[in-house]
Amino acid sequence: MDIYSPAEGSVTEIDGRRKPTILYVFGGGFMEGNRRDGTAMEWFRDLTDDGYGVVAIDYRLGLKGVRGVTASEFVVLLERAINLAVEDLFSATSYLIEHRDELGIDPSALVVAGSSAGAITALQAEYEICNGTPVASVLPEGFNYAGVMSFAGAILVKGGSIEYSRRHPCPTMMLHGTDDDLVPYSRIDSDGYSFCGLDALAKVFSGNGFDYRAYRYLSNNHSVAGFMHFTLDLQKSFLERNVMARHKLNVDALIEDPSLPYYPSGNSNLYDIR
């Protein structure tokens, strides 16, 4: 993992509260990617210049080299890949908690953020914590992240029903393109599994009174996975109000902004490998 401290001279507190540390999980379809990709590094500088610490982690790529499988086979492989990534995220989190004094990190102020596969990992990790599943048992009892920021993420559930059974999720900010053809904006059901993106999750969060912000980018696609640098104002508002001040400010916005990046990605579904 790489650890980036707030820039010298930056403002690291607001009203006596220390700004959280952002725990970043990179994207790449569970096939590729690394913690030092250029888009993320630019965003890390934005955050550290503004007084936030950043930790960027690695994780096992559970779909690396996978080709020529059926849809039924693939959903099982996808579940395994997500589980591996979540396990590694929890391992990194446990390390940060154990070494908090020497690293200068406050475990109660860890915000996990991710892009694409990393966003799936972040959302899925919070889902596992809130349901008390065995994979989350490696974390200290009662631990939860201070927040989640998802750039084009989703969760994978069995049985079709999204349930946070043990506890409410932490404050969660989700950004997603309404025309995302790689990670579902709404949901995909296959062989007893449901792959649920922002639209499906926002319905559950709204219906249960959870603390969340949903930003839906009209007619944009998976480009939103790289919107970290372009949405700093939204992130800082979420971090300062929902996370630091613990002010439940729910937002559900449909955004049409042609100035934001749009990269054609074709019609193939990343999670439908032939």
Model-derived features: where do they sit?
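Short beta-strand element of the alpha/beta-hydrolase
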Residues: G16-G29
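A short loop-to-beta-strand scaffold at the N-terminal edge of the catalytic core in hydrolase folds
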Residues: M1-E13, T21
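Alpha/beta-hydrolase active-site loop
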Residues: V75-E102, G197
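C-terminal catalytic histidine-bearing segment of alpha/beta-hydrolase fold enzymes
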Residues: S206-R274
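Serine-hydrolase catalytic-loop signature spanning alpha/beta hydrolases and amidase-signature enzymes
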Residues: G29-E32, V54, Y95
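The feature captures the conserved acid-bearing segment of alpha/beta-hydrolase catalytic domains
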Residues: E13, A136-N208
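Primarily recognizes the serine-hydrolase "nucleophile elbow" in alpha/beta-hydrolase
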Residues: S94-H168
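Short amphipathic alpha-helix adjacent to the substrate-entry channel of hydrolases
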Residues: R35-I57, K64
